[in-house]
Every structure is written in C-alpha cells, then in structure tokens.
Amino acid sequence: MKIERVSKRRLKIDIFLLIPILLISLIGIVALLSTTITIDGSFGDTSIITKQLIFLASGFILFFLFSFLDISILRMWQIVLPIYLVTVALLILVLIFGPVVNNVQRWLVVGGIQIQPSEIAKVTVILTTATVLSYKDRYNEWLLFFVSLLLTLPMVILIYMQPSGSMSILTLSIWFLVAFTGLNNQLRNSVILLIIGLITSAFLFITVTGNWYYILLSVVGLIFALFAFNYRDTWKIFVIGALVVSILLGSFSTILYSNILKEYQRGRIETFINPTQDTQDLGFNVNQARIAIGSGQIFGKGFGNGTQSKRNFLPEHQTDFIFASFAEEFGLVGSLFLLAMFGIIIIKGLIASINNVNNPFFAMLLVGITMKILLEVFINIGTNTGTIPATGIPLPLVSAGGSITVMTLFSLGLIQSIMNVSQKDKNKGKIIDNYEFIN
C-alpha cells in the first residue's frame, strides 16, 4: 500500500493548532535568548539559540510533511514492527556506545548530533499500543492490553537502566493512558483504577514517611471496592483482581523504594514531601525555582532582567527549570499565556480524538500524543513549582533540546494529518473500519 497525499482541495492546516505551536516555539527562543544575557547586560554564548533554531526547523519540516500525508498506513504491522525494533535497538545502543555524562547514558552521538532515543520511545509506545488495541474487535481486549504492556516493558526497562527513572515512569504512564483509552466500559475501569491507586499509594506513603495515617487511603480504596463489588455481578471478578493487584503493586513499591531505587531517587521523593528541610541539597533547586517564579510577580522583571538565572542561583535554567526563568522575567501574565497556548493544543487533540471515536486507532493515537504533551508540561511545571518531585523532564518546544523538539513537532504533525484525513472521510460519509488498512 502506498501513502497517499491528502487531496489539495481538502488539505488544511488548522490555524488554531499551528498558531499556538508557533507562539510556544517563539517563547522558547525568547526564553533561551534571555538566559544567554550576562550580568553586565551583554549577550554571551548564543550557540544554543542557533542549535535550537535548527531543531525547530527540522521539526517543522516533519510537521508539515506528515500533515500533508495520509498516515493510516501507520496502523500496519509491516510498518509498526520495524519502528518498534529500531527504537529498542537504539535504546540498547545507548547503553553500549552512549557517552557517560554526569553518570548517566542517555544520548547517542551520530555525526556530531546528540540523539536521545527515550524521546523516540515515547512516540513508539503510543504507536505500538494504538496498533495492538485496534484489534480489540477481533481479540479479547485484556489479552491485547497485556500484549501491549509486554511490548512496552523492554523500552521502559532500557530507559530505566540509563538510568532515567522519571523518563521510564513517564513512558509507562503514556502507555497506560493509551491502553486504558482502548478498553471498553470506562466507568468500571475508572473505579478499578481508583481502587488500585488508593491502596498502592497507601503502601508507598507509609513506606516513605513512616506515618500510618496514610492507611486511611487504603480504607477509602476498600470502600470503593465494596461498592463496586455489589454494584454489578460482572464487576466482581474485576474488583477481586484489583485488590490482588493492589497488594502486589503496594508490596512491590515498598521493595522498589527500599531496595531498588538509587539514593538520589529516594532523596527526590523525600525532598518533595518536605523540601524546606533540604535547602542546601536536593531541595535547593526547587526552592530557587520557587523564588524565581515568585519574584516575577504579575508582569515579571522584563526580558533579560532575571536575577536567579543570571547569577547562577537557578540550575539548569535552559532545560529543566526554564519555566522558572521565563516566569521570573514575564511574570504571571506571561506564564498564563504560555499555559493557555499549551491548553489550546491539548484541547484540539482531545476534540480530534472525540471526532475519531469510530476509528479506534486514530482516537488512541490522538489521546496518546495529547497526553504525552500534557504530562510533559505538567511534570516540568510541577517540578519548577515543587508540586511533584524533581525530575529531568524538559518543557516541550521551550526547553533547549533537539530530540524532544523534533519529536514533539513530529507528533503534532500526526495530529494535523489525522484531522485532515478525518475531515476527508467525513465529507465522503465514510466510517473507517479498524482493519481496512491491515489486509
């Protein structure tokens, strides 16, 4: 089968998707440019700006290229399997040939260009999971659920071995959201998820804090379990399974925290619970970010006038903590504008997924890409504000970085392509069968 171009008559670029992308990219360049200004007001090394512009140009080429193509072919295993195998191979090569930077191996250097395969893996997980679950009309959905998990775990484990605990958790979370979307009976599944989440959280919080008051979480979980067990007979087996899984996950989380997580990873969790007791170590970064954000007040200090990054009080101000640097100079107004632009993209993605309810593959692909961006934004800003433990997740299209910039724009190109294909099929009055492009 050939990839067909969307007819020129119906080819459109949604300005409500494109404009926020362009504005966020511009904000990223402005924020990065500001970080190059020295204390005396002059520009320092601006090579990072040149690199980021190249990454953006490359990403926009992919965005427009895939916007113009009918990507229905991506549901074929002849396409998906090679993508999956190449991604796994890249993750293995990182552990063998990747340079060690700050005691981690997360990049491959090819022709002087650094590639971060874990960013590719996030998109591969979305594509693979959407493809597997699109067979749910032919096979048992729970069988497909676990097949998709088995395909995802090698990538998650390889990412964790770099080591990158936060990225491995993010990748697993993306898988779960896509797979969860692909299952039927969302009410039942949501209740089951709530039960597992509450009981597992109780195990983890008691382990970390030693405070047995968190057992109340498990009590609430058991109340929901009792309600669900008596709600419908068909739910009973799922409730029993949820309780078993909760105990297993809770026990595993305790073992994971106590015996598997590295000291710095445990430290991040403990610092998150009480960052003020660690202002000179792991909590220092978060507290400095909070100071930067708070000092920006309503309208900010103005371009190039931030003090936290200029005086090197704010670490990683071009990557992990660029939001704090931006908020210091552009204040609450600038921060809300940036969040609004991300919000428009996320809403567009979710609306598109609803419009593709008759095409499970497209719907799951849209949910996966949208949730990927939402999680990245939430985690990065949550780290900057101290809402969640410190991680190394950059802010898409804003933080400096080639892999995340290119893969984000590529993913957004897939959203635009699906919107074009969906509109074309809608105009034809056509309902797409899950397997139309498989055989």
Predicted features along the sequence, with ranges:
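Cytosolic juxtamembrane amphipathic/interface segments immediately preceding
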Residues: 1-11, 42
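Helix-boundary and loop/linker segments of multi-pass membrane transporters
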Residues: 9-11, 145, 311, 357-358
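Hydrophobic alpha-helical transmembrane segments
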Residues: 134, 283-291, 295, 405-415
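Interfacial segments of multi-pass membrane proteins
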Residues: 169, 173-187, 308-330, 398-406
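TM-adjacent membrane-interface loops and short helices in multi-pass inner/ER membrane proteins
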Residues: 268-319, 330-334
